[in-house]
């Protein structure tokens, strides 16, 4: 399928790339709002060969220690045929003359093995030296971390214990957190050396809230929201998909689709494609019933379990009555100020992918229109 719209976001990111690197950019938004599709469209279709992109996708990794982080970001292979990188000359060829997009930081196998024995800063210094070589060759380096929150719990210590990087969770004394070390390195790349553009993608709004609120990156980071489509854009997207799939959608059909799934690109695409051989209203009702059942099971489990979340130094038990009270706020409103819901409750609902938080605006909303409609139908 051809890429659709997002001209405002595309132009903003291209404008950033035309400037000297000076900030770390966090691209965030609800689940399935199109963050990865957007950044891939830009690096694959909108950039000249003057750029060299290092795209690291943490989505497929379970990272709990330094070794797994190193395995995720570095590669000893030259291409898809798994030919090994022999020496630094081959690395230099890859980063200065090879393809525009690399899905790992190239490193000779012998050097790669050494990284496991050394400090994490040695790995960062190796990457720094590569980025300097890219710049020396006349190209502009771009570093992209997709689903960066996957490393938020990694602790740099000999026991490889796991503690959360969030201030709301309890720390171990003297622990060094990989995320903090990485942020310091990224600040060096952008604010200090002006060497490399850095983009960090995440659908975890609690992670973005942590980054935004701690002040650790104050004056060093900017935030770009990739949200679900607004109604006007969603209706245009339906027209676009109808043409792509040779389907006739009336205005009433499009209004009906929007009333169920809103501007969620993935949901709209599914509905339009399914409508080619199924009844439209049946598709939408099935999706809503599924969302209602999932929400109902979630609430029912609260009759038998006592979930807890950590807030500061306290462990707070979440009660079903408080959850229902919070969700009822969305019966008449799609967006609610986070001040209207206690922190432990909205934290729990975000963790369960029921709510999404925009920390920059302090606004909470359901993760999707389907979830919103499920709340209204069930409560």
Curated annotation (Swiss-Prot):
This is Uncharacterized ATP-binding protein MJ0801. GO terms for molecular function: ATP binding; ATP hydrolysis activity. InterPro entries: AAA+_ATPase (IPR003593), ATPase_dom (IPR011579), MJ1010-like_2nd (IPR049081), P-loop_NTPase (IPR027417), WH-like_DNA-bd_sf (IPR036388). It comes from the Archaea. Disulfide bonds: none annotated. Belongs to the archaeal ATPase family. SUPFAM superfamilies: P-loop containing nucleoside triphosphate hydrolases (SSF52540). Pfam families: ATPase_2, MJ1010-like_2nd. The keyword Nucleotide-binding applies. It comes from Methanocaldococcus jannaschii (strain ATCC 43067 / DSM 2661 / JAL-1 / JCM 10045 / NBRC 100440). Keywords: ATP-binding, Nucleotide-binding.
